[in-house]
Amino acid sequence: MDCNLQSQQNIPYNVLAIPVSNVNALVDTAGDLKKAWEEFQKTGSFSLTALQQGFSASQGGAFNYLTLLQSGISLAGSFVPGGTFVAPIVNMVIGWLWPHKNKTADTENLIKLIDEEIQKQLNKALLDQDRNNWTSFLESIFDTSATVSNAIIDAQWSGTVDTTNRQQKTPTTSDYLNVVGKFDSADSSIITNENQIMNGNFDVAAAPYFVIGATLRLSLYQSYIKFCNSWIDAVGFSTNDANTQKANLARTKLTMRTTINEYTQRVMKVFKDSKNMPTIGTNKFSVDAYNVYVKGMTLNVLDMVAIWSSLYPNDYTSQTAIEQTRVTFSNMVGQEEGTDGTLKIYNTFDSLSYQHSLIPNNNVNLISYYTDELQNLELAVYTPKGGSGYAYPYGFILNYANSNYKYGDNDPTGKPLNKQDGPIQQINAATQNSKYLDGETINGIGASLPGYCTTGCSATEQPFSCTSTANSYKASCNPSDTNQKINALYAFTQTNVKGSTGKLGVLASLVPYDLNPKNVFGELDSDTNNVILKGIPAEKGYFPNNARPTVVKEWINGASAVPFYSGNTLFMTATNLTATQYKIRIRYANPNSDTQIGVLITQNGSQISNSNLTLYSTTDSSMSSNLPQNVYVTGENGNYTLLDLYSTTNVLSTGDITLKLTGGNQKIFIDRIEFIPTMPVPAPTNNTNNNNGDNGNNNPPHHGCAIAGTQQLCSGPPKFEQVSDLEKITTQVYMLFKSSSYEELALKVSSYQINQVALKVMALSDEKFCEEKRLLRKLVNKANQLLEARNLLVGGNFETTQNWVLGTNAYINYDSFLFNGNYLSLQPASGFFTSYAYQKIDESTLKPYTRYKVSGFIGQSNQVELIISRYGKEIDKILNVPYAGPLPITADASITCCAPEIDQCDGGQSDSHFFNYSIDVGALHPELNPGIEIGLKIVQSNGYITISNLEIIEERPLTEMEIQAVNRKDQKWKREKLLECASVSELLQPIINQIDSLFKDANWYNDILPHVTYQTLKNIIVPDLPKLKHWFIDHLPGEYHEIEQKMKEALKHAFTQLDEKNLIHNGHFATNLIDWQVEGDARMKVLENNALALQLSNWDSSVSQSIDILEFDEDKAYKLRVYAQGSGTIQFGNCEDEAIQFNTNSFVYKEKIIYFDTPSINLHIQSEGSEFVVSSIDLVELSDDE
C-alpha cells in the first residue's frame, strides 16, 4: 500500500530477500536429489548435476557432508509407481561421494572435506600415511561398487551406457548371473581391502572414513539383494538353478545382517574406548570436553550408523524416514566465560517452578529429548543503576507450543523479558568484569560490553572461549551446528565467578532441525509420489496422564530407548496423512526370556485391534533360534530387532491412531514404532487439457479397489459402453454451459463439477463412442478454459503456482483417489515452521459493489485455518474434514467423493468436502489496494490438508441493503487505514528526509555527499514499525517491511561508502579496538545511542595506527574529521605537526585540512586528562572541486 512515503528505487542490494539458511540449502539440494533419483528410475540414467552442486555446497561449509548422504539413503526403497526398474541405491551413494566421475580428484576432495570436519568438531586429524591408506581403500570400493551398479543397470535396460533412449527390459538368466558374478568378485575385493585397512590405526579420526566405506558396502548389498528379490523368479531359471541361486541369495542376506551388527560394534568399540571418550567430572571443562567429543562423533559417525539397519531391503521395502531424537550439547556459556570451576547443572523439567533440582553428577546422559517445539526463549535481565555495563541475564523462560518452563535466581515471571524467537541454532555468551563494570550478554541480550578478544577461540579446546589480555573480556564461540536446533536450556552454576554470582549460565541441548514433536505418518513425497515408511522413536510416546516416559541412553539407534516393565503402559498417538494399507511394527530389545505385551490400537476413537503379542528374547542365542531372519544390532541394553504389531488388508483412514502397549512379565526396551505402507499410491496420469480435446489419457486416474471399513475405494478405470450412459454423460456436459453456443458457463457450475464430468467422459468406450467422446472432451476443455478466464485466482487448480506463496511442506501433487489433476497438499512442518498457501487478488481486477463467491474442494483436512479477507478476516474457519474414500464413477449425475446422503458432501456442514462463501466488495481503493486475500495455514503441528478446485468468481451486484452494510465496513476500514498511514508517515518521513540528505540527488542508489560522517549515520535511528510481519502468515513480510529494509540497507550502503573512503581503519570503533595499538587504559564506552566509542581514562592512555596511502600525491589535500569530548589531542607524524586539541565537557565536531609529505603516516590519539572519548574519526581524500 502507499502511505505517501517518498518512494525510492532499489539500492544495489536485494533488500527484500530473506537470507537462505544452511537448512534451506539442504532442503533444496535434497529435493534435487529426489528428482534425480526419480528420473534415474524412469530412464536408467543418473544425473550428477544435483550431486555436484551438493558436494560443492558442502565443501563451502554450507552443511555437514553426511547430511545429504543420509537423505539419499532414505530413498533406497522408493519406486516410481507403475515402473519395474530396480534402481540400485549404490549408484546414488557413488554419485554423491564421487560426483565428477574423477576418482582421484573426487576422493581427495572427500578426504579433505571429512578431515576438515573432524578437525573442526573433534580436533582430530589423520596422519599422512593413514590418510593415504584410507584414500586407497575408498577408491577401491568405488571401483568395485561401480562395476556392480553398472551391471544391475545394464541387466534391466537395452543398449549400453552410451546408448540414447534406452528401453527397459526383463533381465535374462545371463544378465542375472553377470550381476551375481560382479557382486561376488566386488565383495571379495572389499573384504580383502577392509581387512588390510583395519589392521592399521582405526581410531576416532579414522571412524568417519570407515563409516563412509561401510555405508557404501551396505548400499551395495541393498542394491544387489533388491535386484535379486525382484528378478530371481522372472528370468527363467530351471528349478535346480533357481534353488541354487536362492540358496546363494539367502547366504548373502545372512552376511548383510551379520555385517550390519559387526560394523556397528567396530564403531562402538572406538567410540567408547576410554582412551578416546573423556570422563565427566565435577568441573565445567570436563563436561564441555565430553560434550564436544560426543557431539562430534554423533554428527559424523553415529547418526549414520543408526540408519544402517534401514538398508536391509527385506525389512525396508519403501522410501524411509527414521526420526532421530538423540540430543547433543553445546559448550556451556555464561556465568564466567573461559574459566573452569566446580559445576552444578539443574534439571529444567523437574518442576514448573523457577527452582530446580540438580542433575546427578553432572551426567548429561540423563538429559533426553523434550517432546515439544521451543517457540521462543525469554531472558530476564538485571539492570542496576550502575549502568548498562553492569547488566546481566539472571533467568530464562522456555516457551514451548504446549508448555513453558523457567529458571532464575529469583522468579522471572512478570519481569521485563527479552525474547528470541525459534528456531535457535546456537547460543553464545560474553562476560566482562573489571573495576568499572560487571556484565554478561547471552545471544546479544544483557550488558553492552565494551571489551574485545585478543586471543582466538576454539569450540573444541579449553578454555572454549576467546579471552582478552587487556580488559578481562571473554566470549564463547559455539558454532551454528548444521541441521541442528536448540531443544532446551539447562541452567548451571560454577565456582570461580568474578563479580556477581547471579549471572546466568546455560547448557543447550540440540536435536535435528527438521524433527517434528508431533507424530505423523503417511507423508506423501511430492517428488517420488511414495507414501513414506515412518519410524517414530518410542520416547515420543507418553505414560498415563501424559507423563514423559522414562528413557535410557542408546548410542546406536539415534534415539533413547524406553524401558518397559511389567504393568507399565506406553501410549503413542500418531496422525495418518494418507489413507492406505499399513503394517505397524515395533523395534525393541529383550535381554530376558520371551514375554507377552498387550497391544490395543484405536483409530479416531474406535478400536481396530486388541491382541496379545509375544516379544521373543533377543539374546544372541534366541535370535539365532527364534528370529534367524532378523537383522539385529547390539546396544547398551540388548539386541534390537523388529517384530510386527499389526497388519491388515483394510485401509487405515486419515486421522489419529493411538497405540496402547501394556508391559508383560519381563523388562524390555522399546526403540521405536514403525508404520509401513503396504499398498502403492496411484501412478500419475499426466493429464493436460487443451482446446483440441487431447488430454493425453483416455482413462480416469483410478487404479484398483480396496475396502476402508464399510466404504469402497474404487480405482477402475470403468468403461461406459451403453448408449444410455452416453446420453446421461452428454446431458451433463451440456449442463455445464449457459446456452448451446458454449461461450459461457452455467451460473452454478464449479471447477470440481467440471472435473467430475471430465472423469465420466474419459470413461466412455473408445471403441463404441470414439467420435462422441472426442467432441465431448473438446467441450469439457472449453469449459475449463472459460473457468480459468472467470476465476480471479491464478492457479486455482494448482496447474501453476505463479501467484501462490507457499510455505514449508507445501506440495503440488497430481491425481489421487479424490482429485483429477493437480492438488495442493499442506503437510506438517517442524514446530515453528508453518505450512501455508496464500494469494492476493489485486484491487485492479475487482468490480465495485460486487459480491464474489469463494469455493473449493477439500480431500481431507485437520486443523487448517482458512481465511478470506478484504476488510479484515470476513471468513475465518478451521477446516477438519475426515477422509472419505471415492465411490465408483457412474454415468449418473453423482460425484465420486462420497455418497450424496453423507453430510460431508453437504456444503452447509462444517466438515464438508465442499466450501462456498461470499465476500462483498464496496468502493475500490487502488491507492490502498486491499484486494481480496485468501490463505490456508496449518494451525497445529499435526495439521494437514489436500485441496483443489479453488475459485473466486464474480457472483452478482450488491443490493441496496448490502451496499449500505459494506459501506459501513469500508468507511471504518479506510478511516483506520488512513490514520495508520498518517501515523507511520509522521514517524518515517523525518527519517527518510535524513537519509535523502546523505545521497546525491536524494537517490539512495547514488554516492554519499561530502558532508556525511560516521556521526551523521549514528544519529539516524530507524524506528520500530508496526506490521513488519504479515497479519496472517508470520513468515511473510508485512506492509512496512519493505520500507524498513530499504532504510536499513540505505544506511548500510552509506556506511560502506564512508568506510571505503576513510583511510583510518575502524575509525567508527564498531569493532572495538581492532586495528589500533593501545597504550595504557583504553577501553570501549557505550554512548546513549548504543554506539561504541573509544574511551581513554588516564593521562598516559593513547591509541595509534599506521596508515599507508596508495597512489600518494603530496599535493593532494585530505580532511580529518573528529567527533569527541573531554581533554585530548589528535596528531599525525612527528611533534612538529600541528595537533587537533579537545578540551570540552560535551561532544563537539572538529575538522582540519591536512597535507602529507610521505605515503606512510602515523596517527596518534592521546588523552590529556582524566577522560577523552572519541566517537568517530575519519580521514578522507578531498576531490578537486572541494
Swiss-Prot record:
<dbReference type="GO" id="GO:0030435">
    <property type="term" value="P:sporulation resulting in formation of a cellular spore"/>
</dbReference>
<dbReference type="InterPro" id="IPR008979">
    <property type="entry name" value="Galactose-bd-like_sf"/>
</dbReference>
<dbReference type="InterPro" id="IPR001178">
    <property type="entry name" value="Pest_cryst_dom_II"/>
</dbReference>
<comment type="function">
    <text>Promotes colloidosmotic lysis by binding to the midgut epithelial cells of insects.</text>
</comment>
<dbReference type="Pfam" id="PF00555">
    <property type="entry name" value="Endotoxin_M"/>
</dbReference>
<dbReference type="GO" id="GO:0005102">
    <property type="term" value="F:signaling receptor binding"/>
</dbReference>
<dbReference type="GO" id="GO:0090729">
    <property type="term" value="F:toxin activity"/>
</dbReference>
<keyword id="KW-0749">Sporulation</keyword>
<keyword id="KW-0800">Toxin</keyword>
<dbReference type="Pfam" id="PF03944">
    <property type="entry name" value="Endotoxin_C"/>
</dbReference>
<protein>
    <recommendedName>
        <fullName>Pesticidal crystal protein Cry14Aa</fullName>
    </recommendedName>
</protein>
<dbReference type="Pfam" id="PF17997">
    <property type="entry name" value="Cry1Ac_D5"/>
</dbReference>
<dbReference type="InterPro" id="IPR036716">
    <property type="entry name" value="Pest_crys_N_sf"/>
</dbReference>
<dbReference type="InterPro" id="IPR005638">
    <property type="entry name" value="Pest_crys_dom-III"/>
</dbReference>
<comment type="similarity">
    <text>Belongs to the delta endotoxin family.</text>
</comment>
<keyword id="KW-0843">Virulence</keyword>
<dbReference type="InterPro" id="IPR041587">
    <property type="entry name" value="Cry_V"/>
</dbReference>
